[in-house]
Amino acid sequence: MFLKAVVLTLALVAVTGARAEVSADQVATVMWDYFSQLSSNAKEAVEHLQKSELTQQLNALFQDKLGEVNTYAGDLQKKLVPFATELHERLAKDSEKLKEEIRKELEEVRARLLPHANEVSQKIGENVRELQQRLEPYTDQLRTQVNTQTEQLRRQLTPYAQRMERVLRENADSLQTSLRPHADQLKAKIDQNVEELKERLTPYADEFKVKIDQTVEELRRSLAPYAQDAQEKLNHQLEGLAFQMKKNAEELKARISASAEELRQRLAPLAEDMRGNLRGNTEGLQKSLAELGGHLDRHVEEFRLRVEPYGENFNKALVQQMEQLRQKLGPHAGDVEGHLSFLEKDLRDKVNSFFSTFKEKESQDNTLSLPEPEQQREQQQEQQQEQEQEQQQQQEQQQQQEQQREQQQQEQQQEQQQEQVQMLAPLES
């Protein structure tokens, strides 16, 4: 099947943790991996294009979401699949066309830079060295954090194994009651420490992306005087470079996260085994506890050895991409397959635009047509306000009536007093 690599991509998505929603990046990754696995030749890609397979891969992203009552995911899936298959077909057909456009663009840029070939090569070389200087502190920090966090993880987990061995010796008659809380705590501690490890390590990828933007912008300014009227085409090439370099940063983050999840999957069964062995005999449990500390140390050390070189390998990849740019812009450039990065960038931009438009429309629809329970709630509030207004009006009317009655009583009293005065006046005379 063409999609073995895509299946691995979906598995990686599952390993790194399900998100609240299917993201544009996940969809774009599935589509690009599918296209890459078909063929690097556009004609062959069109001939072997099987929409049903791409549809299956996209639907797989929604399986967990549709298990819930999730109207948003269902609507997104209905609109996304036709859009994605159409975009994919157009992608395959436009590949050769884009390749020719990029070739012509490079030829024009090279022609403009040719009289200054030595200066351009020197500027790119200086930029490479500046990039290395920018990244080196962060690479060192990443390596230090890997060592620090793994050592902290080891220190956090090892005492649980030692404590459980001690409890086993002291409470042989009540193993389940005594050891189960410690086994549960070990499981919780594994989850907590792996999450903290990811939170400490993955932000470095974002720092790298900031430095990449700075480096590419400085390179653009340094080459601008030599580009003359080909500046726009040079900028386009630099955009492709920045896209590829930042893609490496995203892949670095994904690899760190995936390695941390793999560590969790290796450590979690150790705690589960302890809980399972509580129902067995004391001798088997004692053997498992004796081996627990060694298993913890080995898995943590394997993680450290695997992740420690990630930063250095990332730096090497960026330097290599800068050198490839120098080769593409040089006078002796060969047939460089540079169009694929632009093709992927275009795909991701279109998928992001689709998601943004869909979410904006969804938000507008929700504003114009509220869900039925919310409509009922608003109607109830309006009715309550009307009732309160009516009650207030009734109270005001009652107050007015009382005031009128009081005024009438006062007037009657005044009239009676005047009549009494008039009746007494003749007697006094």
UniProtKB/Swiss-Prot annotation:
Compositionally biased region (Low complexity): 381-420
Family label: Belongs to the apolipoprotein A1/A4/E family.
Positions of the UniProt region annotated as Disordered: 359-429
Modification after translation: Phosphorylation sites are present in the extracellular medium.
Sequence repeat boundaries on the chain: 33-54, 60-81, 82-103, 115-136, 137-158, 159-180, 181-202, 203-224, 225-246, 247-268, 269-286, 287-308, 309-330
GO molecular function per UniProt: cholesterol transfer activity; phosphatidylcholine-sterol O-acyltransferase activator activity; phospholipid binding
Keywords, comma-separated and alphabetical: Chylomicron, HDL, Lipid transport, Phosphoprotein, Repeat, Secreted, Signal, Transport
Record's subunit section: Homodimer.
Region (13 X 22 AA approximate tandem repeats): 33-330
Keyword Phosphoprotein included in the entry's annotation: yes
Recorded domain comment: Nine of the thirteen 22-amino acid tandem repeats (each 22-mer is actually a tandem array of two, A and B, related 11-mers) occurring in this sequence are predicted to be highly alpha-helical, and many of these helices are amphipathic. They may therefore serve as lipid-binding domains with lecithin:cholesterol acyltransferase (LCAT) activating abilities.
Role: May have a role in chylomicrons and VLDL secretion and catabolism. Required for efficient activation of lipoprotein lipase by ApoC-II; potent activator of LCAT. Apoa-IV is a major component of HDL and chylomicrons.
Cellular component, GO, one term: high-density lipoprotein particle
Gene Ontology biological process: acylglycerol homeostasis; cholesterol efflux; cholesterol metabolic process; lipoprotein metabolic process; phospholipid efflux
Gene3D superfamilies xref list: Apolipoprotein
A Pfam family of this chain: Apolipoprotein
Alphabetized PANTHER family for the sequence: APOLIPOPROTEIN, APOLIPOPROTEIN A-IV
UniProt signal peptide: 1-20
Gene label: APOA4
Tissue specificity of this protein: Secreted in plasma.
Protein name: Apolipoprotein A-IV
Compartment(s) of residence: Secreted
